[in-house]
Amino acid sequence: MLERTLRVLEYNKVKEQLLEHTASSLGRDKVKHLVPSTDFEEIVEMQDTTDEAAKVIRLKGSAPLGGITDIRSNVKRAKIGSMLSPNELLDIANTMYGSRNMKRFIEDMVDNGVELPILETHVAQIVSLYDLEKKITNCIGDGGEVVDSASDKLRGIRTQIRTAESRIREKLENMTRSSNAQKMLSDSIVTIRNERYVIPVKQEYRGVYGGIVHDQSASGQTLFIEPQVIVELNNALQEARVKEKQEIERILLMLTEEVAVEADIVLSNVEVVANLDFIFAKAFYAKRIKATKPIVNNERYMDLRQARHPLIDPEIIVPNNIMLGKDFTTIVITGPNTGGKTVTLKTVGICVLMAQSGLHIPVMDESEICVFKNIFADIGDEQSIEQSLSTFSSHMVNIVDILEKADFESLVLFDELGAGTDPQEGAALAISILDEVCNRGARVVATTHYPELKAYGYNREQVINASVEFDVNTLSPTYKLLIGVPGRSNAFEISKRLGLSDRVIDQARNHISTDTNKIENMIAKLEESQKNAERDWNEAEALRKQSEKLHRELQRQIIEFNEERDERLLKAQKEGEEKVEAAKKEAEGIIQELRQLRKAQLANVKDHELIEAKSRLEGAAPELVKKQKVNVKNTAPKQQLRAGDEVKVLTFGQKGQLLEKVSDTEWSVQIGILKMKVKESNMEYINTPKQTEKKAVATVKGRDYHVSLELDLRGERFENAMARVEKYLDDAQLASYPRVSIIHGKGTGALRQGVQDYLKKHRGVKTFRYGDMGEGGLGVTVVELK
């Protein structure tokens, strides 16, 4: 990729923003060396990797990359036998902990059902060195000091040091508190010089204490003397300190040797966490600029939906739809300067560079982008004072270089093509240059203010005109790209708005040819037609959304009605069964009582009287039971029943659908939300529903309207939404729905991606797709069930 192209498209500014999201110097080093790739497979993998990291951020908010530092030089020094300092060893331990923590973090997410195949592969390369990590942290404290517990010998030596220091201080403090101290000492303090304890003695009393003079004040009036009485104690203290230093060096060498043994593994782990830091920096940057993963194709076309420039404030930038490579291979954007043409040009270029670097791009979901082997850009005014080149010459030098290298795998961006020279000659050159590049099969976006190029798009196949809309009322560009509409200067309208008289403007119009006036009027009508078409589309879209809302409300009311009906049915059935049971118990009780009376010969009761008594009791049972007995006795299905048939269950007088035969005489029947076993003798065949042709919108078998044909997840949290999807698909399968719709909205695409990831692994899902224009488009996934 040409360095000039990266510069004029401000690729390095994107990298500067990306650097802000790295967690370590390792990640920053990766970003600094980032360049766009031209390998299709590598780009697809990089995009998928960034997408997985973005999924982690959506679910967890962050990634545990703290504590990781660039320890590569220290590890290499350990390999060649150099002793590492405590802080260097501590950095190694912290980095080992960070890599181990990152590995556990990703693996825990995978264990909980989150699909992260690429990140899982990355962390699988991390080898835990927990034992070495603990050895270092057990020997070195957080402040970088070797702790007493590093070895028993070190603990003993430091005990000796503390004891010696205590004895020395005690003796010296006794001296400073004596009655003569005020006279002979400059100050009643104990201090240290040359690592030995001393007291400040006035010059004239140097002989009183004896001992060794280690230092004197600037004036020479005070001597820092080590009194003779503590010389031996100070000597013992120094010997202990030498032993301490030797033991510390032994411990550090031991730890350094342990690092050297595992050096290759440590360096491998560092490379993995460096890549992870780099990957998550991309994901955090995508979140910052509200970017999404583009679909990468190898067919040399792009479809950028609502594309934005990443370096412009998203609150003020106007997003545009930019298509190139299918219906046309060249876009010529015409119109006046300061209209936003260059921003559109740079947006195309930087989006391609970002995508080929594995970065998500600031576009809507389902945007597509292709891979270019070369990207050429001639943008901006780059006069060369050293080479005495004018603006035109500078551009032409660059264009000559482009024409030497451009081919069918190239994207070429021309800004103000042919500018800086005679307009007529410049326009002719622009047309010739465009023809040359187009004939090579390159994809081209060019801007110009020459009116001669307005007809270019109409006279060439695979070329289309475009313009950036200009509001003559506010005298400012709207920055909205109008594909298919060439630009116009608006000079007369702007002049009139600024106060130029109609007489002068009319005279100016007379100087323009009739053909030019006709072209300008035609362009004005095209702009107006496009605005009207867009307004009509927006109105139609609003009506469609209103219709969808009414449809959902109707579905909700139907569900509530059926639920209430089924609830009442269940309640009535339960009450009926309770009454039947109560009547039966009462009858049995009376009969038992009569039998006992007869046995006791307390009453002359015959069997036929018992039967009559039971009949009278049964006559008191609810009408429901009597109806059931009559129906069971007098009816039998004459039609051979099959699963899917619609029947009437005589017990309840309700229609149901046969699910499966559970025995020779019983079927499992679905009645509303109820599923129950019913005998064949207690049902009446109605019909066999015809197999209707499957439509784009899901239909329902039988009459089960209790499960909605669509599930609305908009506004739901990610975890709640996934739980609702799982339950909804189970309910839809029980209701034998062939097809349902899941509304997730467009938004950032997180919910959509989560839904579709879940659908891929659901055993009950046959296929799924996005909704058509009338079904909700990208905001809806239509699911076909098995």
UniProtKB/Swiss-Prot annotation:
Primary enzyme class: hydrolase
Binding residue positions for ATP: G335, P336, N337, T338, G339, G340, K341, T342
Every Smr domain range: 711-786
GO annotation (BP), single: rescue of stalled ribosome
GO molecular function: ATP binding; ATP hydrolysis activity; ATP-dependent DNA damage sensor activity; endonuclease activity; mismatched DNA binding; ribosomal large subunit binding; rRNA binding
Cited function: Endonuclease that is involved in the suppression of homologous recombination and thus may have a key role in the control of bacterial genetic diversity.
Name of the molecule in the record: Endonuclease MutS2
Species, as recorded: Bacillus thuringiensis (strain Al Hakam)
Gene: mutS2
